[in-house]
Amino acid sequence: MKFAIESISKNSGRLGQLRIKDGGPEFKTPLLLQTTKGGSIPWLSADVFETQVSRKPQVLQFTLSTMEQMTEALTHWNSGGGRGLSDYVGLPGHLNILLLRDPCETTPSGGNDRDILPLFTRRGKESLSAERYMEIVASFKPDMYEGLCDADTNLESAKKRVQKSVDRTEKFMHYIYEHRGKVNSTLLAPIVGGYNTFARTQSIKHAREQPAGSYGGYIFEGFHTNGLSATTLDTSELLPIVEHCVKQLEEDKPRILPGAYTPLTILELIQQGIDVFDTSYAYCASLNFKALTFSFVQDAVEHVPFLDITDEAIKEDFNPPLSNCNCLTCQKHTRAYLHHLYKTNELLGPILLMVHNLYHYMDFFEKIRESVAKDTLPQLTELVRNQNGKTQVDYSIAANTKVISKATMEKGFAAAAV
């Protein structure tokens, strides 16, 4: 993996070019990974994603917690001449990264053992050792993969739990570093330690002590428990820790921060020097019946961050979900129609909502890269912060009380309503 910095600004972060595989496409950073569940973009077929969301190659974010059951099949697939993980899930032409935990769902706490990491899958809790993890990585053959780490920490974690997460991660990574040569994939060094600067420094020091070429980048873990918790993080606590960590890292490696961070938090993290994020925020919004409507284009109109499609007030609103959006949903359909799909249990509902949210979020990142290049990210941050209003906009996502379960949501909107 090769990472080259095009420009660095004190006010706007950094702009870079990331090439994951020799001969593969180059990706501009700040980069947005495409979050998947079970190897698929939630609610979207490969054809819909590639024709209605993005026609360009993307980096798919796979998670072991949602794909562990595919290990045996992938072993046979790759040993029989299979063309890799993306081809296996029906998304050829895209590169991929393998993470441990699903950033879209809350990860249960506990279950930690000295030599074992708990992995919460669709079959329940699995015990994952460093040896077993490397066997799985060898079977999956991802383009990039996260080092095994204990990320069971958040803002409320006790000092003892934080220290254990660092010590256990070092033990796991000692084995990973020794055996990484058996896997033809780029390793990402995990940086853990919760909100403790000393613990984070210890984690960084352990990674930087490794021989040159041991890993291709850094991935930050342990700030939250995934799911909606990432949308409510206190940035006054988060940003100083990130700043502390970034100062200790070399410039020529990408920095990845998975999780459903809000648009405003992402902009502030980019100013700190983070390079790669994911689309789990767009998924969480879709799951909770919200269309993203925040503006990132300068105008004089006050905007709101979401459109709640369960709101009875839009049942006769024949405007598009977002007037200046060029996605299929906004070009062909109305707010009233989305509300109708929600009320009538139509599977088309979550499909159209996810198409819009992904399209809008990817457009947002295009604007971010443009702003970083022009060193105007502070102005974009101010717009996203207030949306031309007088107070800061709340981008946090609360679980919709009308949602019963994710399983019913996948069958349509109304099936999930009370």
UniProtKB/Swiss-Prot annotation:
The source's superkingdom equals: Eukaryota
Entry's cofactor comment: Binds 1 zinc ion per subunit.
| Signal peptide positions on this chain | none
Record bears the keyword 4Fe-4S: no
One GO biological process term is: tRNA-guanine transglycosylation
Q: Give the UniProt keywords, A-Z.
A: Cytoplasm, Metal-binding, tRNA processing, Zinc
One Pfam family of this chain? TGT
Q: SUPFAM superfamilies, alphabetically?
A: tRNA-guanine transglycosylase
Annotated GO molecular function terms are: metal ion binding; tRNA-guanosine(34) queuine transglycosylase activity
Which positions in this protein are listed as binding Zn(2+)? C325, C327, C330, H356
Task: Name its co-factor(s).
Answer: Zn(2+)
- GO cellular component terms, A-Z: cytoplasm
Q: What quaternary structure, including any partners, is listed in this protein's UniProt entry?
A: Heterodimer of a catalytic subunit and an accessory subunit.
Which family does this protein fall into? Belongs to the queuine tRNA-ribosyltransferase family. QTRT2 subfamily.
What this chain does, per the entry, is described as:
Non-catalytic subunit of the queuine tRNA-ribosyltransferase (TGT) that catalyzes the base-exchange of a guanine (G) residue with queuine (Q) at position 34 (anticodon wobble position) in tRNAs with GU(N) anticodons (tRNA-Asp, -Asn, -His and -Tyr), resulting in the hypermodified nucleoside queuosine (7-(((4,5-cis-dihydroxy-2-cyclopenten-1-yl)amino)methyl)-7-deazaguanosine).
Q: What is this protein called?
A: Queuine tRNA-ribosyltransferase accessory subunit 2
Origin species? Drosophila sechellia (Fruit fly)
